[in-house]
């Protein structure tokens, strides 16, 4: 861990800025379930109202992030969404309602992903349900147009 330059965090910070969300902390962990669980709980303790985990969830079947999120006691809404890019998205809520999301790598490089469909609702304080995620399957395939017009396109129309 620490051998690969973190290019994910700047992308998340920019997406958060669009909704005037302040990033109150950033913790880098290796793929260790206990450390990830501890980091999530530490961010919650610092007052985080939303927690975003990034890592190898979309490419590494042994990634520890989903298990670490579950180990916090979070209620898993879904680990997977009928949306491309973003099929390996994980959504959960801590006991007090704080959303904890596990983001697949596509969020780092694709302009529009499942995170872009979910983030506005989370930012507005709306709890996203399994049914909401299922509805995202209608228009859930980003065509990757040469010139992106999201949100003025068919992507996410089921939201």
Predicted regions and their residues:
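Gly/Ser/Thr-rich loops at beta-strand to alpha-helix junctions
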Residues: 1, 56-60, 105-109
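Glycine-rich phosphate/diphosphate-binding loop of Rossmann-like nucleotide-binding domains
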Residues: 1-31, 35
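Short, solvent-exposed amphipathic alpha-helical segments in soluble enzyme
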Residues: 6-12, 41-42, 67-71, 116-120
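Short acidic (Asp/Glu) and glycine-rich catalytic loops that position anionic groups and cofactors
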Residues: 19-20, 48, 96-99
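Short catalytic-loop micro-motif centered on adjacent basic/acidic residues
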Residues: 23-26, 52-53, 102
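Short N-terminal signal/transit or membrane-insertion segments
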Residues: 28-37, 151-159
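Glycine-rich phosphate-binding loop
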Residues: 38-90
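Flexible glycine/proline-rich
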Residues: 68, 72-159
